[in-house]
Curated annotation (Swiss-Prot):
Probable heterotrimer consisting of an alpha chain and two beta chains. The alpha chain can probably have different glycosylation states. Keywords: Glycoprotein, Lectin. GO terms for molecular function: carbohydrate binding. The lineage of its organism: Eukaryota, Metazoa, Porifera, Demospongiae, Heteroscleromorpha. It comes from the Eukaryota. Lectin with affinity for N-acetyl-galactosamine, carragenan and glycoprotein porcine stomach mucin (PSM). Has metal-independent hemagglutinating activity towards erythrocytes from rabbit and human. Hemagglutinating activity is not inhibited by D-galactose, D-glucose, D-mannose, D-fucose, methyl-alpha-D-galactopyranoside, methyl-alpha-D-glucopyranoside, N-acetyl-glucosamine, N-acetyl-mannosamine, D-fructose, alpha-D-lactose, beta-D-lactose, D-lactulose, D-sucrose, fucoidan or glycoproteins thyroglobulin and ovalmucoid. Optimum pH is 6-7 for hemagglutinating activity. Activity drops rapidly at lower or higher pH. Thermostable. Retains hemagglutinating activity after incubation at 60 degrees Celsius for 1 hour. At higher temperatures activity drops drastically. It comes from Haliclona caerulea (Blue Caribbean sponge). Glycans are attached at N73. Glycosylated. This is Halilectin 3, alpha chain.
Amino acid sequence: QPEEPRCRETPETWSGVLYIISVRNTEVLFTISSSSYDRTEQKIKITMVKSMTNQPLKTVLDDYEKRIRYCKNETLEGELPSFGVPENAHFDGPVETLGAKIAGLGVTVAHYTIAERGFSYFTYHPLGDEGTQCIPITNSIATLD
């Protein structure tokens, strides 16, 4: 793996578990979600499977082709997210392995931070030798308002 994998986008399609931690003033959100991403179909589906803060569990399907967010029934703005490392993120190297360091059991991860109006921490699994694509593992965001 490169010293600093700087992936800008995820592969065309992927699915997995995404951990989201968000802190805003006195509100704390921690959810575990089953997620799927499809750039060809322009869809992102996130199904909350567990909430540590008694948030109601829900499924949200963002259809960027039709510009509709199902579940919340609102119009989508912008483009389909690339889920890559944000441009202004700082690499907190080195790349490391989570779990067992035995072939097929551990996962290689790279950590990045952003310190703007709070603190954001992102963990990605870089793919391939170049590290130009990645899959998000965790997003942790603390916002100071």
